Amino acid sequence: MWVATQDLPRSAAHPFYTRLNQILDAADFDRYAEALCQRFYADDVGRPGLAPGRYFRLLLLGYFEGLDSERGIAWRAEDSLSIRSFLGLELHEGPPDHSTVSRTRRLIDLETHQAMFTWVLHRLADAGLVKGKTIGIDATTLEANAALRSIVRRDTGETYDEFLTRLAQASGIETPTREDLARIDRKRKHKGSNDDWTHPHDPDAKITKMKDGRTHLAHKAEHAVDLETGAVVAVTVQDADEGDTTTSIETLIDAAEKIETVVPDGDGLEEVVGDKGYHSNQALVDLEAVGVRSYVSEPDRGRRNWTKNPKARDAVYRNRRRIRGARGKGLLRQRGERLERPFAHLYETGRMRRVHLRGHDNILKRVLLHAGALNLGLLMRQLIGIGTPRSLQDRAIALLRCIWSLIRLPDTLWDAISRLYRPSTSLGDVLTLRDDRRLDFSVPTAFTTGC
């Protein structure tokens, strides 16, 4: 059956994605992506693959649409005509299948995803949204796509139930019941050690206590954020059982390199702001050694003996003086605002709190483009006042409510005035206005600042 072109379904392109595409096209986004990914594609062998520019746009959609899986991204691309326009799909072209997106992600290496993240930082630096002087650092846990019941012993390869059964039989219980296994498990110490247990399909996932108190296999995502603008300048994914003072080394090195790349005329990284988890003697000494001032909250460790470590004493005391000053207090307050916001946008509304991929490299590829989309949202907010498509929808709803309130205003006023002037029961009385009667504006209206 033939269908005329004018009879095919059409939709007005989403204004947010239209403006975003204009920004990407003006900076040769597709040409840059194709040049980076050329070595991963054969010239004339096999089926045509997913275009690099289209692939990276699909990953950007994960943040803008709040989609946590590649399957969900593919479904959304198939469902929306405006997103098809953003992806550059013609009417006769079908959107890529989720397996095509996954295969392309595995094909393109991590360094290329890092380069695309840096490309976005260049666009922010051109707009003055990357200063690079003061960096805040913080981390969060991402729930792994792996179940605790599937972990195995590192030495023997036994599953958890097989290991408990062997312990029960060694203690004299030949056929242990579930209650016996549970009792033996409760009495054991160090039952959740990452030194003894691993997941066979995701060795990078570590047994970790989540922020809500649950114990789960997880990964650790760490951000470095420009505290002057809120731009994410570096993202790393590391072992969830590593301490903050250990993982911060890789993140700060990555942040310093990216700042030097995108702001070559600047002074580079000068200040680091962190919470109590990043406070240690060696961490403060290392920061001073490279000429970086620290503003790190200090936990209460009581009286300390500095006789054998005067260098650490000086670093700790200088950090303490800085955080007690006016600038230090201001930076620590700013850290709570500028650092927590990306975590909320990326992992709560961005739906990446639980990952569907396995392995640090695969997860980091998604998180890098997720953070890149957040940075593009900052640029869009500077240019048009909104940072996500949903923000535009909220403004449209507020505007419609204001219009509806204005339409209803005459009826509302008439009803109020009618209640003020009420006929007297006596025929000789005239209409009177009682002193205690007031205009009643209790009718629900939608006067908001969204007007």
Regions found by a protein language model. Give the residues of each.
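Polybasic low-complexity intrinsically disordered regions
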Residues: 51, 75-78, 87-292, 297-299, ...
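Helix-centered, glycine/charged polyanion-binding patches within enzymatic domains
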Residues: 171-174, 277-361, 387, 451
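Glycine- and acidic
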Residues: 39-43, 55-62, 232-238, 268, ...
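Basic, amphipathic alpha-helical segments enriched in Lys/Arg and hydrophobic/aromatic residues
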Residues: 239-245, 329-427, 434-436, 445-451
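Generic start-of-chain signal for non-secretory N-termini
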Residues: 1-12
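Basic, short loop/linker segments at the boundary and entry of helix-turn-helix/winged-helix-like folds
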Residues: 10-60, 65
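Conserved, non-catalytic sequence blocks in retroelement Pol enzymes and Pol-derived host proteins
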Residues: 47-49, 110, 362
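Short, charged amphipathic recognition helices of the HTH superfamily
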Residues: 67-77
